[in-house]
């Protein structure tokens, strides 16, 4: 097959992906091989591929394809999350467009409509993953609501309940009044809102005075139950134990001592509303209030309802919370108890989907005893059973698990795993995997099922084992079954649990990663994965966070359409540095598209010069130094790549193969062998060179395949008839015996020699076509041998002709390589005086800008107060001007 003149990614990507999938090449079908397993973080079934997905899934695919090339039984579990809230909202919006509401249907009818939507529209993101090149095991695609996974979810709920680790309790939750459900912290978006800080005075019950409190939510005073002061605050020590009489309600509430009150903040006294504030809830418990006795003044829509003590005036009942706020402030002002109002920017929680202000709300929900489950999870990381990369995240992990709270796992939705709990007429609960079992527990009493569903994080926490056979395969074979050479007898669960690596954004470390560790240890007795890799965010080119409101989001599919999937994948991999966010600039994607084009053109050159597929895994025999050098460089690249991938240093691995392909192979090797392949050259040397070049190109394609799967598969087949695809080829062996130090030293010297001459020519504005004589001074015998042996290459690539004798007097450039100095006469080639003046002027300008930037960076006011992206740009500009001044200075120095 003749390689087309132009590289067109769109012409090859869909064809090769269909070929791989149709031929089952993504499936783990090597039962005797070492298993290697990754589970994909299941994207929402409602979702579309965003740039964060593209990063996350590219990093996983690099590891999976690499493991496959290493001969492992590579399984990449793929599937989607049912996304309770998001999916229910999508279907409700569709109904709304038809003038219908969810409540117009029975629960069963509505759920049937959700399944209809899922079958029709739920495959968008999986189709988009294919466009990225993700080599997932699509034949066994999972869904968190499919029958097998749902069975696992119900079993876990029932087992945890029976073990006393899951229970019903009254606690505060993040309540979304728009969706009328509890939501997780991850679904809460904090925004800065311009608001007020109201200062009230509460009269002491004995009439002896008043105490000042301040609040940003005055309406909640209708449910105040205490005023807290710091026990060390001398101003209030005598008041501890006394009571105040609340304005409006007349409720008597105690003054309690609690360290939550900060003597330095406001008056030092804090109103306590345990039913509507997370901090106050804890203060209330410490003060002796039971959750069941804490006052609640809002309903599910955040409208005022009567408290248990009946003290809220009737004209407040039914008011929206913000209407109630205005009415409370007006009433307190009318009583003369409004001391002052301050303008303040308030951190306000919003539901990320409803955009409603979130209300801390006291309600009955189902909770998991996360504190008990967290202890083994902490030890798993401390002991090294799980390696966290970057290691710096372990501190955050420990801090969160050491202070973990009970986990609210119930949601007030219809779509999701309905909680397997039933109630009799007296409210007694019966927990079982199905209604028949619950009825048996209840002795045949009439039962009503709990209407709530489970938090999607509860089900997705089972993903590493619930997707590969648990609970059906649990206990079928001992783990050592496949290790003893009987791999075919081991269940999928035994072979692929624990998983090898989990790739995750750091933002779900607590919501998903830690909970998988807790559930995996509890139900499987082993960690769910051996390594946890946490990547950063993909940001805009200027470092700002991407958001639709800013209009700076990047569509990965648009980049694929424009530059190809390989270019996007390589960009994300090359920019993925442990512990850092990615600043995505489209120019980088364009640059790596150019890299793909360079590889394409190198393959065209090879094909046009009779270089084809290699016939051997081992490097061919070679006598020419340039061939021995490129073989050694190939082996060194394999070694470096193996280390970088093992250490999950993605940027290092991508840059290693990039530098080898672009510089060593294309810029140097192919240029150096052109004379060897020319017509009339030594046929033996030409044959050797074709064999070596073909072998090296094969190794390049295999090494590059995990990063750029499409172009490598295309070129693999274009360069020769193969009876297997590159996706299942063999990873190169890093045989150090193939490294020839003498050849490496010689060609490295040649590259330095040509590079220094080229730099001198460029820096001094020597016309590209001008040939210059070069006079060697102080060259050793070995250097003179090298000059003679490589004279043709030097003349061709540096455009200089080696001359004997002394250099003529006059202006000249001086190039130093090792011990030798090369004099390049420039009289009549360039205007030496004008060139000196140009360089001096350029140096002065660069140094002036450099020094100005240094002064700005040395100013603490700039570094501390300027936007981070402005400081970073100043640092980059300073480095650029420093390098420019250095390079211009070196050019001037060469003129002597």
From Swiss-Prot:
GO terms for molecular function: aminoacyl-tRNA deacylase activity; ATP binding; valine-tRNA ligase activity. Its EC number is 6.1.1.9. Residues 831-857 form a coiled coil. ATP binds at residue 548. A motif ('HIGH' region) lies at residues 43-53. It catalyses: tRNA(Val) + L-valine + ATP = L-valyl-tRNA(Val) + AMP + diphosphate. It comes from the Bacteria. Gene3D superfamilies: HUPs (3.40.50.620), Isoleucyl-tRNA Synthetase, Domain 1 (1.10.730.10), Valyl-tRNA synthetase, C-terminal domain (1.10.287.380), Valyl/Leucyl/Isoleucyl-tRNA synthetase, editing domain (3.90.740.10). The keyword Coiled coil applies. PROSITE patterns: AA_TRNA_LIGASE_I. Keywords: Aminoacyl-tRNA synthetase, ATP-binding, Coiled coil, Cytoplasm, Ligase, Nucleotide-binding, Protein biosynthesis. It is found in: Cytoplasm. GO terms for cellular component: cytosol. A motif ('KMSKS' region) lies at residues 545-549. InterPro entries: aa-tRNA-synth_I_CS (IPR001412), aa-tRNA-synth_Ia (IPR002300), Anticodon_Ia_Val (IPR033705), M/V/L/I-tRNA-synth_anticd-bd (IPR013155), Rossmann-like_a/b/a_fold (IPR014729), tRNA-bd_arm (IPR010978), tRNAsynth_Ia_anticodon-bd (IPR009080), Val-tRNA_synth_C_sf (IPR037118). GO terms for biological process: valyl-tRNA aminoacylation. Pfam families: Anticodon_1, tRNA-synt_1, Val_tRNA-synt_C. It is an enzyme of class 6 (ligase). HAMAP family: Val_tRNA_synth_type1. Belongs to the class-I aminoacyl-tRNA synthetase family. ValS type 1 subfamily. NCBIfam families: PRK05729.1 (NF004349), valS (TIGR00422). Catalyzes the attachment of valine to tRNA(Val). As ValRS can inadvertently accommodate and process structurally similar amino acids such as threonine, to avoid such errors, it has a 'posttransfer' editing activity that hydrolyzes mischarged Thr-tRNA(Val) in a tRNA-dependent manner. ValRS has two distinct active sites: one for aminoacylation and one for editing. The misactivated threonine is translocated from the active site to the editing site. The C-terminal coiled-coil domain is crucial for aminoacylation activity. Monomer. This is Valine--tRNA ligase. It comes from Rhizorhabdus wittichii (strain DSM 6014 / CCUG 31198 / JCM 15750 / NBRC 105917 / EY 4224 / RW1). The lineage of its organism: Bacteria, Pseudomonadati, Pseudomonadota, Alphaproteobacteria, Sphingomonadales. The gene is valS.
